[in-house]
A protein has these predicted regions:
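A metal-dependent hydrolase metal-coordination microenvironment
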Residues: 1-113, 117, 123-133, 139-158, ...
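Short, conserved loop/helix-junction motifs that constitute active-site signature segments
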Residues: 131-132, 163-165
Length: 290
């Protein structure tokens, strides 16, 4: 079984960006222009507590979206819940009476793809990630959280959830605000023939996408317990799973493009990481053992 079919069209997109409609530094028009110039096929403008109603021309699809949040600033411990809704079909009117679960439920009711944004940056606890129900994905990488706060990676929470049988889809995003070093880094590549939200959303549901900072995952094939990976040249390809020791499933070399790994009985799932010579990464979604 191929998780996505080689040779099929892949669309590049960012599911998290801000503009002057909330706390971003550039206008909606300038945001769209810059992502278009950088070769993105689709974009979600996720201003805080505001739904952008969408836009499309021959070069880029801008999906209706917003980011909804509860910030517990000045409390001990200080933390936040930020949750994006992409493809939401109507405005969500949110105030501080909403619990984080209310936000998720509202996004799902509005038909949205619901992502828990930057939980490590937000100083969420792991238990809070468990207690929050029915969200679709977690940002494994968030550019602004990395370059301005040093807390951009949430892979640990993804693995800890998966080891407990809670499998979330994996995205990488920019969450761009300043548009200096916090843009055009984290993105997803989605297999869809047509650049429409309907096809992109279906591909997200079916895990026909991967997250990246630059490396490419050309193919992941699953044959029973065997996982076969083809990728752009890498210095390391590794498979993360629910077991502790990773030596057997970590492959180092110069310009590695192909690895094969058979899951032992003790491993219930795996996800693939491809790391290039510059340390940039690509991440697959979680592959659950049949």
């Amino acid at each position: 079984m191929d998780l996505w079919q080689p040779g099929k069209r892949l669309l590049k997109g960012n599911l998290h960006a801000h503009t002057t409609a909330s706390d971003g530094r550039i206008s909606i028009e300038e945001c769209i222009k810059r992502y278009k110039e950088h070769g993105y096929d689709f974009l979600a403008i996720t201003d805080h507590r505001k739904r952008f109603k969408g836009y499309q021309d021959e070069d880029i699809l801008v999906i209706p979206a917003g980011e909804y949040h509860r910030n517990f600033v000045g409390q001990a411990p200080e933390h936040a819940f930020h949750i994006t809704g992409v493809g939401i079909e109507y405005d969500i009117i949110q105030d501080d009476s909403f619990s984080p679960q209310d936000i998720v439920d509202a996004i799902k009711s509005a038909g949205g793809f619901c992502t828990l944004a930057h939980p490590i940056w937000s100083l969420m606890t792991f238990q809070q990630c468990i207690d929050l129900k029915n969200y679709d994905a977690i940002e494994i990488y968030n550019t602004i959280s990395d370059v301005y706060s040093g807390r951009g990676y949430s892979d640990l929470y993804i693995d800890m959830l998966a080891s407990r049988g809670i499998y979330k889809k994996i995205t990488a995003v920019d969450d761009a605000h300043h548009y200096d070093r916090d843009a055009f880094v984290g993105y997803i590549m989605v297999q869809a023939e047509n650049n429409t939200w309907e096809e992109i959303h279906q591909a997200l549901k079916e895990n026909r996408f991967y997250a990246s900072q630059g490396p490419q995952i050309h193919r992941i094939q699953v044959e029973g317990a065997k996982i076969i990976v083809d990728a752009s040249p890498a210095s390391c390809i590794r498979l993360m799973s629910n077991t502790l020791s990773g030596g057997r499933r970590t492959f180092y070399g110069e310009d590695i493009t192909h690895v094969e790994y058979t899951l032992p009985e003790s491993e219930r799932y795996a996800r693939v990481e491809v790391i290039d010579k510059n340390g940039l990464k690509a991440w697959s979604n979680i592959i659950v053992r049949e």
